[in-house]
Structure formats: C-alpha cells, structure tokens
C-alpha cells in the first residue's frame, strides 16, 4: 500500500502545535492568566513528547525536523516558563529576578544547541543534565502549590522561584547524568506494570490535577538532586 505523501509532515505538524502552545503561554502570562499559561506549557510538553515518537514510528526524522523541534523547545520551555515565573513572582526581586530569568533562558538555549551537535545515540538511557521540558516543570512548582492552596502570593514565593529557576538552569547545562524514559527498553512484565502505573497516574490527574502535578514535579526535583549529589560524590571520590 502506497504511503500518503502528507505522512512525512505529521511529526513537524505536531512540533508546530507545541510551538503554538508555547507562544500562547506567553500571551496568557502577559494577561496574568497564570493557569492557562501553565496549561499551555504542559500541552507543549505533551506535543513535544509525541513529535519525536511519531517521527521514529514513521521513520521520518530529518535535520529540518530536529531544528524546528529545538526552536519550539526554546520558546515553549525556555522563554515561556521563564517569562511566566518572572511576571508572576520574581519581578518582586527587581534586577536580580530579571537576571535569573535571563540566566534560565540562556541555559535553555545552550542546552538545545549542545543537544543538536552531540551524538545522542550514545545516550539511550541517560540524559546529561535535565531536558528543557522537565526544567520548565520544576520551576513552575510554586505555581502548582499556589493553585492548590488558593492563597495570595507570599513573600516566600519569589525566593523559592529564584532558587528553583537557578537550579534548573544549571542542571540543563550540566554534565550530571540523569534518567531518561524516552528510549528506555523494559521487559514485558515491567512494561505491564508501567502501563498500570501510568493508568493510575492518569486517574489521579483527572481527580486531583494540580496535587498530582505537584507531586510528580517534586519527585523529579528530588531525583535531580540525588543525581547531582551522586555526581559530586563520585567526582570527589575519584580525585581523593
């Protein structure tokens, strides 16, 4: 059966949907519609996961697609979340808050540039540093908490955001090995358990969306911290 000529455009179309979601997040951030801004970044992450998966399934990977994906990631997970956090919280820190936002954006750009030139085939189960969608999820932790509590922004939020944004920026450009599930191969038994776990997660997301999102983000943050501590422990043990 002949392949439809439009099939090759499907992965890039999904990437463009991620880009549109990221730009929409910027619009909602400017309008101070924080929940929609966060949801647009989450939607961008959803599309970002599936564009690569679809490209591999259809065997339609291309240099053009890779460059478009990086541009989309920079806007959706570099520029959009940094602007969101600055407009919502860290603007209260004045110039320092703006510098931290710029630092995160620059780190996202550097990570994506490095990702493009490195041979990622050697990293089937490990990322070096944290990917930009995960970094965006981490720096939005205070927003998830605020949505749950339904409280007014407190003086602690800007400081927490500044620390998380700086940490996420550093981790994006670091050489710290962190787990990756994109290309993880699992045995049949573990695959079934993974499917059950995902189903349970979806149930909790439907019932307790922001609470579940917060727990997942905190869990990833703790894993990243553990990876960083393990990296330093291994490094100092080698040099001592």
In which residue ranges do the predicted regions lie?
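C-terminal membrane-associated helical module and adjoining short loops/tails
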Residues: 124-240
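Topogenic membrane-insertion module of multi-pass membrane proteins
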Residues: 1-49, 227-228
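Interhelical loop and helix-boundary elements at the membrane-water interface
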Residues: 1-19, 54-74, 113-134, 177-191, ...
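Hydrophobic, membrane-inserted alpha-helices
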Residues: 20-24, 79-80, 195-203
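Multi-pass membrane catalytic core of lipid/isoprenoid biosynthesis enzymes
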Residues: 9-16, 57-112, 142
